[in-house]
């Protein structure tokens, strides 16, 4: 029986070569709300023998996992459930045995999709959850295959599925569990040989940004952040991770700061493949994608969710969900952008800084949905703990810290990796000024102003008559000038006739 016909449930199940995943969601305010996420390490690909036959033990691990999933599918109509099998099931010559029993357990057919179709769905998952509209290269390292895609917006122009994966490479090149240079070299060279046929095509097509959509990339980002690095993955950082891994003799001893026990087993093999991809395609840098296969499955079932700008869809959804005053947010945004335009020539902030200021202004009152007095603290907590498709982890963290400080007491921003410390402080200053200038919430009462800038010194000039007619705003601006100046960010308030 369906409890909520207005907001139906959807389920996406990914029978991966390393892990089985189930994701149950519903649509809320134009965005996807997660209701359940279940993951089990089945390592199906590890059960393939030299004749590509799945062992009884591996199949049983899979069936046991599906029995757990089945309980949660009972109340979701079959047309809103999609179950996909990937590389291990494509490869297994006896997959029909596994699939027949899987259908009996789940009550729905498992769709074993070709590699190119998997790549296409992965790209849709990335496109719906990652910010920016640049031409992008997407790399997803799975248990038994690696998908490499080039696309722009929601359209992919090149789709490839390579028969290299972190589980199969583990069993082939780290079978003895030794983390030696010889094992790493063999794994990297073999992956390069598999990638070589697509190098010319992908190099000619080109890309502007690169994102990784896999557990390997997520593990790398967790390690880098734990070790005080930013979230941008580069070849030099990958080599550094390889050197750290090789300090341990055996895989069972691997204890890199930031690497979870759950990810450790397939980390060296996944790392080897990623190094090969970077070197073969001359990738300069990579960031973590917001989603991949499961997200693509869900967004294709929810076709109405398609939006040309993922981040704008996210901001609109959060505003609706928390019933924020969008008219006021728009007025504060216009003021913040006007302030920023006065600083452009001197500060030359990157486009990302401008967009993070915009996002922060759009959401600056989110904390008041809980309580006004500590609204900054509540805002920071909410931003850190809700899904924001299109924004990276570092960007979410910075938005949270900006909103923690959007009014009243002013403290230094903590270390963050979304912007330079100087530029993050600069957009914080403009956010705070915009909020004060709009505090009457009457857009007709906003004053004409001018802002001049010399390095870090700001001079804000307002009409004397307006300051006289708005004494509270005058006091708040004077207090803000003192607070920013005390932080070493000079702010001078002047009057004009």
Curated annotation (Swiss-Prot):
InterPro entries: ATPase_NBD, GppA/Ppx_hydrolase, Guo-5TP_3DP_PyrP, Ppx_GppA_C, Ppx_GppA_N, PyroPPase_GppA_Ppx. GO terms for biological process: guanosine pentaphosphate catabolic process; guanosine tetraphosphate biosynthetic process; nucleobase-containing small molecule interconversion. Keywords: Hydrolase. Pathway: Purine metabolism; ppGpp biosynthesis; ppGpp from GTP: step 2/2. It holds the Pfam family Ppx-GppA_III. It comes from the Bacteria. It catalyses: guanosine 3'-diphosphate 5'-triphosphate + H2O = guanosine 3',5'-bis(diphosphate) + phosphate + H(+). One of its GO terms (molecular function) is guanosine-5'-triphosphate,3'-diphosphate diphosphatase activity. Its EC number is 3.6.1.40. The keyword Hydrolase applies. Belongs to the GppA/Ppx family. GppA subfamily. Catalyzes the conversion of pppGpp to ppGpp. Guanosine pentaphosphate (pppGpp) is a cytoplasmic signaling molecule which together with ppGpp controls the 'stringent response', an adaptive process that allows bacteria to respond to amino acid starvation, resulting in the coordinated regulation of numerous cellular activities. HAMAP family: GppA. This is Guanosine-5'-triphosphate,3'-diphosphate pyrophosphatase. It comes from Photobacterium profundum (strain SS9). The lineage of its organism: Bacteria, Pseudomonadati, Pseudomonadota, Gammaproteobacteria, Vibrionales.
């Amino acid at each position: 029986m369906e409890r909520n016909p207005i907001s139906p449930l959807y389920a996406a199940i990914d029978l991966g070569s390393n892990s089985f995943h189930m994701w149950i969601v519903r649509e809320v305010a134009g965005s996807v709300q997660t209701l359940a996420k279940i993951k089990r390490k089945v390592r199906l690909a590890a059960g393939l023998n030299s004749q590509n036959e799945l062992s009884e033990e591996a199949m049983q691990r899979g069936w046991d996992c599906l029995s757990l999933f089945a309980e949660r599918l009972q109340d979701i109509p079959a047309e809103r459930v999609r179950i996909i099998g990937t590389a291990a099931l494509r490869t297994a010559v006896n997959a029909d045995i596994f699939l027949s029993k899987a259908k009996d357990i789940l009550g729905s057919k498992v769709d074993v999709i070709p590699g190119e179709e998997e790549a296409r769905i992965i790209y849709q998952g990335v496109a719906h959850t990652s910010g920016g509209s640049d031409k992008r290269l997407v790399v997803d390292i799975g248990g038994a295959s690696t998908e490499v895609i080039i696309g722009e917006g929601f359209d992919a122009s090149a789709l490839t599925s390579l028969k290299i994966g972190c589980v199969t490479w583990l069993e082939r090149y780290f079978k003895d569990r030794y983390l030696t240079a010889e094992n790493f070299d063999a794994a990297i060279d073999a992956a390069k040989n598999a990638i070589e046929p697509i190098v010319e095509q992908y190099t000619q097509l080109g890309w502007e940004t690169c994102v990784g959509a896999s557990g390997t990339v997520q593990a790398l980002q967790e390690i880098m952040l734990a070790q005080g690095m930013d979230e941008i993955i580069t070849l030099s950082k990958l080599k550094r991770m390889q050197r750290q891994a090789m300090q341990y003799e055996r895989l069972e001893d691997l204890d890199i700061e930031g690497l979870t026990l759950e990810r450790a087993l397939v980390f060296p093999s996944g790392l080897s493949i990623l190094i090969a991809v970077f070197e073969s395609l001359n990738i300069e840098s990579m960031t973590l994608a917001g989603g991949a296969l499961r997200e693509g499955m869900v967004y294709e079932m929810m076709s109405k969710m398609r939006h040309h700008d993922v981040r704008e869809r996210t901001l609109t959804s959060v505003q609706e969900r928390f019933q924020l005053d969008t008219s006021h947010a728009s007025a504060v945004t216009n003021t913040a952008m006007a302030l920023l335009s006065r600083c452009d020539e001197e500060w030359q902030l990157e486009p990302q800084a401008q967009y993070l200021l915009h996002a922060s202004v759009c959401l600056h009152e989110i904390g008041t949905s809980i309580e006004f007095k500590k609204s900054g603290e509540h805002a920071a907590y909410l931003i850190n703990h809700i899904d924001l498709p299109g924004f990276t982890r570092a960007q979410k963290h910075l938005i949270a810290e900006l909103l923690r400080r959007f009014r009243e007491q002013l403290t230094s921003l903590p270390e963050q990796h979304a912007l330079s410390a100087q530029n993050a402080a600069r957009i914080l200053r403009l956010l705070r000024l915009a909020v004060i200038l709009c505090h009457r919430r009457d857009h007709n009462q906003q004053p004409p102003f001018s802002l001049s800038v010399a390095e870090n010194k700001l001079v804000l000039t307002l009409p004397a008559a307006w300051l006289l007619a708005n004494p509270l705003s005058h006091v708040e601006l004077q207090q803000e000038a003192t607070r920013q100046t005390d932080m070493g960010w000079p702010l001078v308030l002047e009057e004009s006739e």
